[in-house]
Curated annotation (Swiss-Prot):
Highest taxon of the lineage: Eukaryota
Cofactor requirements of the protein: pyridoxal 5'-phosphate
Source organism of the structure: Rattus norvegicus
Entry-annotated residues carrying N6-acetyllysine: 247, 256, 334
CDD domains: AGAT_like
Keywords: Acetylation, Aminotransferase, Mitochondrion, Peroxisome, Pyridoxal phosphate, Transferase, Transit peptide
UniProt transit peptide range: 1-23
The protein's name in its UniProt record: Alanine--glyoxylate aminotransferase
Family annotation (InterPro entries): Aminotrans_V_dom (IPR000192), Aminotrans_V_PyrdxlP_BS (IPR020578), PyrdxlP-dep_Trfase (IPR015424), PyrdxlP-dep_Trfase_major (IPR015421), PyrdxlP-dep_Trfase_small (IPR015422), SP_NH2Trfase/AEP_transaminase (IPR024169)
Xref: Pfam families: Aminotran_5
Cytoplasm is among the record's keywords: no
Motif Microbody targeting signal, residue range(s) on this chain: 412-414
GO terms for biological process, alphabetical: glycine biosynthetic process, by transamination of glyoxylate; glyoxylate catabolic process; glyoxylate metabolic process; L-alanine catabolic process; L-cysteine catabolic process; L-serine metabolic process; Notch signaling pathway; oxalic acid secretion
Length: 414
């Protein structure tokens, strides 16, 4: 016995010596980066673009709280509180409600990867970039994608969608509630009931609308709803919220094939988030600090009340629109009834380069606004009054910045 231990010790010792010799035969060719020799410094800015938005002080403070393990009982309590907060802002009682460890794009993929199988018929409302993205993801899955293409700035009627449902017989319809690339608010009443008459599920993207616009997941018959953390909720970007009702859950759990993504497989995520009422099963390491922040952001909107949040966004944006009209700016969305109350799009004034305007507002006022995205690129300026930032004071500040930018930025007279 002792001889065997001694022999093992000699063997391990020779291996350790070999490792040391090998380490000595190599050199560090990459020096420590000079840029990392000093602490990080971030400029103070007012974020009035389409997102992310400024963090509320309480949310910002949550980011400096102590780390705990993601599979500890204290963390499970936080996760349960987050689930309750999501159920409140979604207005749903779905047990299968959780956070995806990834941005709104990841929530979109979570929905599509779990709901669609190769060969499934998928109907997409494409009136901005998010419909385009949903269609591309579904094509990669192998679904049969049918796009209802609209001009940027337009929305869908029940009649138009019914025609698509009757023609293509999809298993899933995708609509964007708040199309942040164009500034359109898509009405949702009646679409869930319509889809169900055609044995189709309704998937809604509410990344740019949640918290700023009324949405009622259960009452409006929405089968799958997702949103992001970084807009009205004023939490750090990088996590997203999602909920599946029983019809959607049944579709997921009766698949013939496994979802193409292990990371976003809802059958695993539901176990991690305790959605099945059983012992939680580890799937991946959760972004603990981001979840602290999301918990606090959901607490803030719960304390404020959804109806108060909706009203505040409506009033702040109405004031912004008044200021923009006084500047002579034209709204990209012509119909006032379908203008998104969280993100406003105005047409780039004739003769101006939108980049000059955005740069001037940032350089002289420390305010971030944005140009267009996807089909609205080079066509619009996007201004967001999101959550904590949705105030008439901020509307006045960005309007004054735009007024000065239009006076000083170069204008092409041709």
């Amino acid at each position: 016995m002792f001889r065997m231990l001694a022999k093992a010790s000699v063997t391990l010792g020779s291996r350790a010596a070999s490792w040391v010799r090998n380490m000595g035969s190599h050199q560090l060719l990459v020096p420590p980066p000079e840029a990392l020799s000093k602490p990080l410094s971030i400029p103070k800015r007012l974020l009035l673009g389409p997102g992310p938005s400024n963090l509320a002080p309480r949310v910002l403070a949550a980011g400096s709280l102590r780390m705990i393990g993601h599979m500890q009982k204290e963390m499970f309590q936080i996760m349960d509180e987050i689930k309750q907060g999501i159920q409140y802002v979604f207005q749903t009682r779905n047990p299968l409600t959780l956070v995806v460890s990834g941005s709104g794009h990841c929530a979109m993929e979570t929905a599509l990867f779990n709901l669609l199988e190769p060969g499934d018929s998928f109907l997409v409302g494409t009136n901005g970039i998010w419909g385009i993205r949903a269609a591309e993801i579904a094509e990669r899955i192998g679904a049969r994608v049918h796009q209802m293409i609209k001009k940027p700035g337009e929305h869908y009627t029940l009649q138009e969608v019914e025609e698509g449902l009757a023609q293509h017989k999809p298993v899933l319809l995708f609509l964007t509630h708040g199309e942040s690339s164009t500034g359109v608010l898509q009405p949702l009443d009646g679409f869930g009931e319509l889809c169900h008459r055609y044995q189709c599920l309704l998937l809604v993207d509410s990344v740019a609308s949640l918290g700023g616009v009324p949405i009622y997941m259960d009452q409006q018959g929405i089968d799958i709803l997702y949103s992001g953390s970084q807009k009205v909720l004023n939490a750090p970007p990088g996590i997203s919220l999602i909920s599946f009702n029983d019809k959607a859950k049944s579709k997921v759990y009766s698949r013939k094939t496994k979802p193409v993504s292990f990371y976003t497989d809802i059958t695993y995520l539901s176990k991690l988030w305790g959605c099945e009422g059983k012992t939680r099963v580890i799937h991946h390491t959760l972004p603990v600090i981001s979840l602290y922040c999301l918990r606090e952001s959901l607490a803030l909107i719960s304390e404020q009340g959804l109806e108060n949040s909706w009203r505040r966004h409506r009033e702040a944006t109405a004031h912004l629109h008044k200021c923009l009209r006084e500047l002579g700016l034209k709204f990209f969305v012509k119909d006032p009834e379908i203008r998104l109350p969280t993100i406003t799009t105005v047409t780039v004034p004739a003769g101006y380069n939108w980049r000059d305007i955005v740069s001037y507002v940032l350089d002289h006022f420390n305010i971030e606004i944005s140009g267009g995205l996807g089909p609205s690129e080079d066509k619009v300026l996007r201004i967001g009054l999101l959550g904590y930032n949705a105030t008439t004071e901020n509307a006045d500040r960005v309007a004054e910045a735009l007024r000065e930018a239009l006076q000083h930025c170069p204008k092409n007279k041709l």
